[in-house]
């Protein structure tokens, strides 16, 4: 066990092999001794991984680009909170470079395959985190989610992907992809585990300009809740996905839900703005200095995505923002008639071969039902729904207004446990469902304390601070 005040020992190593014996490329950096600061706290005994765009003090943050890599001198806020809650960090995971992708193949550290069938993509950009959870290598993992990066790989690997309301978890110490819509996401085998992690990490952070003090909805959904589904769902010709979604709709009906067909036109157009308008300039802005100096160190098609961000004027950005605002207003008309949205997490699976043949088109398909969520300020939860006849997982995403995180979790757990699925790719049965307590955000005000003696991390009285919500900064 390594105390956070020591320099962590790390290695660059592979994860376990796939069923074909090929490496899974899920890890970029391993911490062989683990990193733990206390044996007390609500997450004591649990292990986790962090996507390699999230800072861990003394360990390189590569964002899957060696030329960009740096060694931070402090933990990201979310990592610090997890360590203070007793969790043990085992390493940092692979991702689509600069978190630009939804497929898990855009990394010089190797493509991460699907945990069920290595011929298929894992989904991304939180590919390594999803694989590590699905394979049972960690108890949970951190990802990020700008356009679906925490949901798509969850849906494709039979695990839970919790995309919280924007600003609910601090993004301080996270290398941004598009700062105004970035979220830290949680990947876990069960909804209860994901919520347990969320409880340990949520709360306003005055040092993060995009952190927010949110009023979280704690009233359960009605017994006969209304769930919106796309009036004309798109599966890109994947009949197995279409059948799996219909099965999931029946599963929600069995939980008391009433399906309501929803016009997705404003959501679909909003999704297109993320890459097909001047909003893509925010991705370029996130790495502008590096990209202007070393664009040749960025792999394709990430390089082309970032390059596209250089072509717009400030007027173009405003025009895109105005259009997004108009679409957000149109989308508001959906909510009086429903309590929650339900969509396929991904409309189809894609082979590694097909992704390499046409990486832009295939990636765009995977984001069909995810790209609009952060732009419209929604919360989302991807939960496993079934295993298709071809052996590949299918997941659905429950979407609600900002602050509906607990409501989504409560419904998501009921739905997930009714499926009879196992945990990820491990074959282990789901543990018994347990009540999910209403989420209580940390208060925004805090008292700064200098701590000495037995209250330091790893010492006997540190638990007294942790029990009162203290966070080491």
List each language-model region with its residue ranges.
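A short helix-breaking turn/cap at a secondary-structure junction
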Residues: 29-34, 163-246, 266, 410-440
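Short Gly/aromatic-enriched secondary-structure transition segments
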Residues: 62-69, 461-473
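Gly/Ser-rich, acidic/histidine-flanked active-site/gating loops
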Residues: 48, 54-57, 68, 81, ...
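Short, well-ordered alpha-helical
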Residues: 1-71, 75-76, 98-101, 218, ...
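Short glycine/serine-rich loop segments
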Residues: 75-76, 80-201, 374-397
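Glycine-rich, small-residue loops and helix-cap segments
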Residues: 84, 201, 312-445, 455-456
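Short helix-loop capping/hinge segments that flank enzyme active sites or metal/cofactor-binding pockets
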Residues: 43-65, 223-224, 278-332, 384-392
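Acyltransferase
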Residues: 239-263, 287-293, 317-338
């Amino acid at each position: 066990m390594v105390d956070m005040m020591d320099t962590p020992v790390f290695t660059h190593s592979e994860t376990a092999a796939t069923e074909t014996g090929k490496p899974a490329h899920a890890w970029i950096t391993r911490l062989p001794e683990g990193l733990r600061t206390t044996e007390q706290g609500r997450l004591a005994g649990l292990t986790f991984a962090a996507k390699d765009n999230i800072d861990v003090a003394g360990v390189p943050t590569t964002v899957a680009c060696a030329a960009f890599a740096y060694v931070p001198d402090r933990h990201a806020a979310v990592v610090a909170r997890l360590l203070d809650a007793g969790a043990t960090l085992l390493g940092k995971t692979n991702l689509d470079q600069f978190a630009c992708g939804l497929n898990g193949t855009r990394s010089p550290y190797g493509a991460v395959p699907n945990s069920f069938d290595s011929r298929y993509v894992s989904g991304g950009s939180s590919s390594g985190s999803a694989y590590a959870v699905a394979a049972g290598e960690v108890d949970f993992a951190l990802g990020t989610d700008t356009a679906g990066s925490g949901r798509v790989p969850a849906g494709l690997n039979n695990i839970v992907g919790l995309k919280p309301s924007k600003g609910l978890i601090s993004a301080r110490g996270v290398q941004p992809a598009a700062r105004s819509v970035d979220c830290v996401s949680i990947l876990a085998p069960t909804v209860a585990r994901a919520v347990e992690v969320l409880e340990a990490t949520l709360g306003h952070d005055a040092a993060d300009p995009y952190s927010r003090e949110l009023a979280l909805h704690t009233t359960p959904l009605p017994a006969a809740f209304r769930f919106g589904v796309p009036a004309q769902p798109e599966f890109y010709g994947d009949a197995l996905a279409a059948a799996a979604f219909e099965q999931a709709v029946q599963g929600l009906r069995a939980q008391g839900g009433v399906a309501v067909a929803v016009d997705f036109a404003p959501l679909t157009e909003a999704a297109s703005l993320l890459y097909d308008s001047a909003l893509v300039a925010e991705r370029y802005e996130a790495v502008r200095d590096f990209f202007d100096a070393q664009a040749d160190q960025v792999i394709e098609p990430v390089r082309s995505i970032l390059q596209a961000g250089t072509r717009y004027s400030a007027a173009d950005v405003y025009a895109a923002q105005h259009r997004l605002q108009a679409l957000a207003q149109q989308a508001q008309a959906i909510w009086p008639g429903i309590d929650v949205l339900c969509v396929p997490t991904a409309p189809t699976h894609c082979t590694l071969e097909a992704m390499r043949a046409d990486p832009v088109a295939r990636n765009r398909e995977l984001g069909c039902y995810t790209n609009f969520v952060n732009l419209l300020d929604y919360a989302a939860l991807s939960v496993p729904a079934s295993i298709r006849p071809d052996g590949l997982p299918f997941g659905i995403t429950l979407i609600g207004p900002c602050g509906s995180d607990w409501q989504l979790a409560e419904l998501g757990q009921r739905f997930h446990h009714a499926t009879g699925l196992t945990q990820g790719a491990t074959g282990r049965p789901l543990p018994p469902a347990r009540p999910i307590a209403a989420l209580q955000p940390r208060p925004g005000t805090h008292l700064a304390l200098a701590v000495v003696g037995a209250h330091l991390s790893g010492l006997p009285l540190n638990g007294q601070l942790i029990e009162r919500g203290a966070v080491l900064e």
